[in-house]
Swiss-Prot record:
Residues 579-630 form the LRRCT domain. Phosphorylated on tyrosine residues by LYN after binding lipopolysaccharide. Belongs to the lipopolysaccharide (LPS) receptor, a multi-protein complex containing at least CD14, LY96 and TLR4. Binding to bacterial LPS leads to homodimerization. Interacts with LY96 via the extracellular domain. Interacts with MYD88 and TIRAP via their respective TIR domains. Interacts with TICAM2. Interacts with NOX4. Interacts with CNPY3 and HSP90B1; this interaction is required for proper folding in the endoplasmic reticulum. Interacts with MAP3K21; this interaction leads to negative regulation of TLR4 signaling. Transmembrane receptor that functions as a pattern recognition receptor recognizing pathogen- and damage-associated molecular patterns (PAMPs and DAMPs) to induce innate immune responses via downstream signaling pathways. At the plasma membrane, cooperates with LY96 to mediate the innate immune response to bacterial lipopolysaccharide (LPS). Also involved in LPS-independent inflammatory responses triggered by free fatty acids, such as palmitate, and Ni(2+). Mechanistically, acts via MYD88, TIRAP and TRAF6, leading to NF-kappa-B activation, cytokine secretion and the inflammatory response. It is a single-pass type I membrane protein. It comes from Bos taurus. Residues 24-632 are extracellular. It comes from the Eukaryota. The gene is TLR4. This is Toll-like receptor 4. Glycans are attached at N35, N73, N205, N238, N282, N309, N497, N526, N575, N625. Residues 830-841 have a biased composition (Polar residues).
Length: 841
């Protein structure tokens, strides 16, 4: 027990300490691609983590403390293809360090202060194509043991301490070398012996970068008969004289691409004289680029004479001022002028020029016509140019133009429908201000146009024929514009070959049902950043080839259930994020559809509810159908309850007095009646009731007590309550005096209906009908129930004659005596006049 207690006492603090350690200390690397790519950058590692899988192909160990790389250091990763060891403070690399990495193609050693590099350090790297050894304290290429890397294509040893340009003999064993970067070293002189290996074993695909080396001298003839793919000399010369002599030292060089000049932040030359380029006459060049040279001195008319036969010339950030140097008819086929300083637009006349790029230039606002008859590609973007009456072949001096980019300029007024430019395939106006585009069919003649960009051109589309003639168009971008009434009309009728359409940020609220009917080839449709309120899938039903649909950043609440089936079957990518979804049971089918279509919907997890308030900013996927089932149950129960209450209320309201009568029957059912009969009659017949009925019955023998409303009803009590409580409940029988006035009186009919109920509820009750006068059958049939009763039952009919009166009163008294408790007097009187009642129908 004591031993166990001691063990527990020791383990508890240890466990506490371990629990405080970060989980990264056990598994430090970030898994970028499972079992393939791992990033272990800046983790203070002193060795390679043991838990990295053997299948790893990309491993980043940069910014650690590996310091010493021993033999077979990476043999656990035979599949490795890319290894980054940048700035790991590596000082020693032993023999066979990378042995076994037969698939490694890229090795990066940047920023390591290597002091000892064994001759067999790079053995085993039979597939290595790129080796980066920037800032590795390398002093000479002779000390770099790479002669066996026959597949090496790129060697970057920039920013070291190499003083000699001498290329070792082993370069003859690197036949695939394409790029050698020696920039920012300490090379000052280049001699013929330095490049002897290039004379013996030409590397025709080699591009050589010597920028930022303090060159002072190049021995004449050094590069004679040498062929290079490219040579870059930027920020190399401290004076104009040195530059001139060094360029002359390149005489005899044949290169596909030559780059001269300086870097933006590495300026050494104060002035640039046209004579600097005279030495280029002794070189054979296909492409020439000059960058960041300004303050030209002297006449620059003949500046480019030595470049007359160059195919491609590029001027980057050059301040020429005068344009005389560009006004000659050189044989250039490709001219780039980027971010240069000119007084005015160059009026070029280059008969061979096929491609002209003139972008980001300063202080030029007015376009000037030029003559370029062979021109096919023209890029004039970002110059703040204005065009009046654009565009026709006379503006550019060519009828062969296929690519025209006028984007990011000022105002462009369309004055013609591109006459003479029928071969155009690419046209870009984005972020320029287009005018008069609604005046006529500006693109009518462009039947070969495949790409059109009029995005953010400040146009409001009114003219429905704006795209007439564009029968070959495949890509149309028109984002950031607007439409009349914010409605997208049917303007794409002729665009049957369209595959990409961008309508984002067009303030669209509605889309015509036939807007996309002609676009059966459309594959990509961008409807984002508009004001659409619903996902109307009927619009997209004709788009049989549609693969990508972006409806993000709208105001879509939902889509109708029956419409969701109309989305094209070809659709593979649908973006509905950033909309105002209504997560309510009304749209339950749509919300369920969102859950079912997660593979189709991009960013389904980012689809948020906008309403109701209790679900605002919650994911649409969090909506639960059970909520709707519960709500439906509650609603159903509530509806049924309301209906039942309503029905009961209506029945109670309709039969309120009948219920009162029923309650009274139970209350007074066993008591004695006060009245012999309750008389129901019309006020129009009150004289007959007073003078005949009351006088003969109450003053006759035997006397009968009648209940009359004008005499026996209690004041202050509702008429209906008096009728039931004083009339029916306290009377043995009911006398109904039927006349034309009775039939037409609502109160009389009401009293009669209550009397029927009273007769049904009380076994002793009886109704005696007295018909005062002959009634028209048409009038009597208006009261169906009364008509039926009078047709089937015995009633008394009043006749104003001596015999008729005698018979009437005898029969009425007999009817009233039925069920009446007999008194001795009443019995004797009744026996003196025994008579039978006669029936009249």
């Amino acid at each position: 027990m004591m031993a166990r207690a001691r063990l527990a006492a020791a383990l508890i603090p240890a466990t506490a300490i371990l629990s405080c350690l970060r989980t990264e200390s056990w598994d430090p690397c970030v898994q970028v691609v499972p079992n393939i790519s791992y990033q272990c950058m800046e983790l203070n590692l002193y060795k390679i983590p043991d838990n990295i899988p053997i299948s790893t192909k990309m491993l980043d160990l940069s910014f650690n403390y590996l310091r010493h790389l021993g033999s077979h250091n990476f043999s656990s990763f035979p599949e490795l293809q890319v290894l980054d060891l940048s700035r790991c403070e590596i000082k020693i690399i032993e023999d066979d360090t990378f042995q076994g990495l037969n698939h490694l193609s890229t090795l990066i050693l940047t920023g390591n202060p290597i002091q000892s590099l064994a001759w067999g350090a790079f053995s085993g790297l039979s597939s290595l194509q790129k080796l980066v050894a920037v800032e590795t304290n390398l002093v000479s290429l002779n000390d770099f043991p790479i002669g066996h890397l026959k597949n090496l294509k790129e060697l970057n040893v920039a920013h070291n301490f190499i003083h000699s340009f001498k290329l070792p003999e082993y370069f003859s064993n690197l036949p695939n070398l394409e790029h050698l970067d020696l920039s920012n070293n300490k090379i000052q002189n280049i001699y013929y012996e330095d490049v002897k290996v290039l004379h013996q074993m030409p590397l025709l695909n080699l591009s050589l970068d010597l920028s930022l080396n303090p060159l002072d001298f190049i021995e004449p003839g050094t590069f004679k008969e040498i062929k290079l793919n490219g040579l870059t000399l930027r920020s190399n010369f401290n004076s104009s004289h040195v530059m001139k002599t060094c360029i002359q030292g390149l005489a005899g060089l044949k290169t596909n691409r030559l780059v001269l000049g300086e870097f933006k932040n590495e300026r050494k030359l104060q002035r640039f004289d046209r004579s600097f380029l005279e030495g280029l006459c002794n070189l054979t060049i296909e492409q020439f680029r000059i960058a960041y040279l300004d303050k030209f001195s002297g006449d620059d008319t003949d500046l480019f004479n030595c470049l007359a036969n160059v195919s491609v010339i590029s001027l980057l950030s050059i301040s020429l001022g005068s344009l005389q140097a560009l006004l000659k008819d050189f044989r250039w086929q490709h001219l780039e002028i980027i971010n240069c300083d000119f007084d005015k637009f160059p009026a070029l006349k280059l008969s061979s020029l096929k491609k002209f790029v003139f972008t980001d230039n300063k202080d030029i606002s007015t376009f000037t016509e030029f003559q370029l008859p062979s021109l096919q590609y023209l890029d004039l973007k970002r110059n703040h140019l204005s065009f009046k009456g654009c565009c026709s072949h006379t503006d550019f001096g060519t009828t062969n133009l296929k690519h025209l980019d006028l984007s990011f300029n000022d105002v462009i007024t369309l004055g013609s429908n591109f006459m003479g430019l029928e071969q155009l395939e690419h046209l870009d106006f984005q972020h320029s201000t287009l005018k008069q585009i609604n005046a006529f069919s500006a693109f009518l003649s462009l039947r070969n146009l495949r790409y059109l960009d009029i995005s953010y051109t400040n146009i409001r589309i009114v003219f429905h024929g704006i795209f007439t003639g564009l029968v070959s168009l495949q890509t149309l971008k028109m984002a950031g514009n607007s439409f009349q009434n914010n409605l997208l009309p049917d303007i794409f009728t002729e665009l049957t070959n369209l595959t990409v359409l961008d309508l984002s940020k067009c303030q669209l609220e509605q889309v015509a049902q036939t807007a996309f009917h002609s676009l059966s080839s459309l594959q990509v449709l961008n409807m984002s950043h508009n004001k659409l309120l619903s996902l109307d899938t009927f619009l997209y039903e004709p788009l049989h080839s549609l693969r990508i649909l972006d409806c993000s950043f709208n105001r879509i609440m939902a889509s109708k259930e029956q419409e969701l089936q109309n989305l094209p079957r070809s659709l593979t990518w649908l973006n509905l994020t950033q909309n105002a979804f209504a997560c309510v049971c009304e749209h339950q089918s749509f919300l369920q559809w969102v859950k079912d279509q997660r593979q189709l919907l991009v960013g389904a997890e980012q689809m948020m509810c906008a309403e109701p308030l209790d679900m605002e900013d919650m994911p649409v996927l969090s909506f639960r159908n059970a909520t709707c089932q519960l709500s439906k149950t509650i609603i159903s129960v509530s509806v049924v309850t309301v209906l039942l209450v309503s029905v009961v209320g209506v029945l109670v309201y309709k039969f309120y007095f009948h219920l009162m009568l029923l309650a009274g029957c139970k209350k007074y059912g066993r008591g004695e009646s006060i009245y012999d009969a309750f008389v129901i009659y019309s006020s129009q017949d009150e004289d007959w009731v007073r003078n005949e009925l009351v006088k003969n019955l109450e003053e006759g023998v035997p006397p009968f007590q009648l209940c009359l409303h004008y005499r026996d009803f209690i004041p202050g009590v509702a008429i209906a309550a008096n009728i039931i409580q004083e009339g029916f409940h306290k009377s043995r029988k009911v006398i109904v005096v039927v006349s034309q006035h009775f039939i037409q009186s609502r109160w009389c009919i009401f009293e009669y209906e209550i009397a029927q109920t009273w007769q049904f509820l009380s076994s002793r009750a009886g109704i005696i009908f007295i018909v005062l006068q002959k009634l028209e059958k048409s009038l009597l049939r208006q009261q169906v129930e009364l008509y039926r009763l009078l047709s089937r039952n015995t009633y008394l009919e009043w006749e104003d004659s001596v015999l008729g009166r005698h018979v009437f009163w005898r029969r009425l008294r007999k009817a009233l005596l039925a069920g009446k408790p007999q008194s001795p007097e009443g019995t004797a009187d009744a026996e003196t006049n025994p008579q039978e009642a006669t029936t009249s129908t």
